Amino acid sequence: MAPYHIRKYQDSDHRSVVDLFRRGMEEHIPATFRHMLLLPRTLLLLLGVPLTLFLASGSWLLVLLSILTLFLSLWFLAKYTWEKHVMNCLHTDMADITRTYLSSHSSCFWVAESRGQTVGMVAARPVKDPLLQKKQLQLLHLSVSLQHRREGLGKAMVRTVLQFAQMQGFSEVVLSTSMLQYAALALYQGMGFQKTGETFYTYLSRLRKSPMINLKYSLTSREGDL
C-alpha cells in the first residue's frame, strides 16, 4: 500500500482534481447501463419492438438493427447522465474551488496525495437552510483513484470531513449519493451514516428508478468516536 497524505486543496491541483473527478464519475456508466437494461420496461421494449418488426417485415436485419439501436440509446443515456453531472459541477461549485470552499473557515476541500499524484478528493460546506434545527455540514465530491481503492483512503477522507465538522461545531454531516454508486453507499453506511430518504432530482432519474440516497451522520451522538 503506497503512503498518502491528505491536505488542503491548492490552485495547482485543479487539473488533477478535475481529471480524478471526471474519471470517477465515468466509472458509473456501465452500472447505470446495466441498471437500465434490466428495468421491466426496457426488457419489454427489447422483446416487443424486434418481435413487432419481424412480424411486420419478416426481416432479421431490421430486428438486429432495432436491438442495436436500443442498446446504443441506453448507453448514450447512461453516459449523458454522468457527463451532465460532471459539467454541472465544473460550472458551479468546482468552477472556482478556492473561492467556493477555502474562503470560509466553515468549508474546505481536501486532496489526498501519493508519490506526487492526486489520488483522492473530498469537499465539505455548510447547508444553508434557515429552517434547519441543527447545524449541518454537507459532504461532497468524494473520489478515490481506482489504483488506490481498498487501502482505507476513502474512509480516511470521510473521517477528515467528520473531524472537521466536529471541530467547527456542526451537529450533523449529510450527503446525497446515487443508488448506483454501490461502493460509496457501502462505505458511508459502514462508517455509521444513516439513510434519511430518497430524492429524484430529474425526470430521467425517476424514469430509470435510480434515486439519490440521502444520508446523515449525527456527531452529537458519537462524540469521542472520531
Curated annotation (Swiss-Prot):
Designated name of the protein: N-acetyltransferase family 8 member 3
GO cellular component assignments: endoplasmic reticulum; Golgi apparatus; membrane; nuclear membrane; nucleus; perinuclear region of cytoplasm
- The source's superkingdom equals Eukaryota
- In terms of one coarse class, where is the protein primarily found? nucleus
What are the cysteine partners in each disulfide bond?
none
Which CDD domains does this one have? Answer: NAT_SF (cd04301)
Q: Tell me, what is one Gene Ontology molecular-function annotation carried by this entry?
A: N-acetyltransferase activity
InterPro entries the UniProt entry points to: Acyl_CoA_acyltransferase, GNAT_dom, NAT_camello-type
Q: What class of enzyme is it?
A: transferase
Give the UniProt keywords, A-Z.
Acyltransferase, Cytoplasm, Membrane, Nucleus, Transferase, Transmembrane, Transmembrane helix
The compartments listed are: Nucleus membrane; Cytoplasm, Perinuclear region; Cytoplasm
Q: Name one GO biological process term.
A: negative regulation of cell adhesion
- Reactions mediated catalytically: L-lysyl-[protein] + acetyl-CoA = N(6)-acetyl-L-lysyl-[protein] + CoA + H(+)
Instruction: State the gene name recorded for this protein.
Output: Nat8f3
EC numbers, comma separated: 2.3.1.48
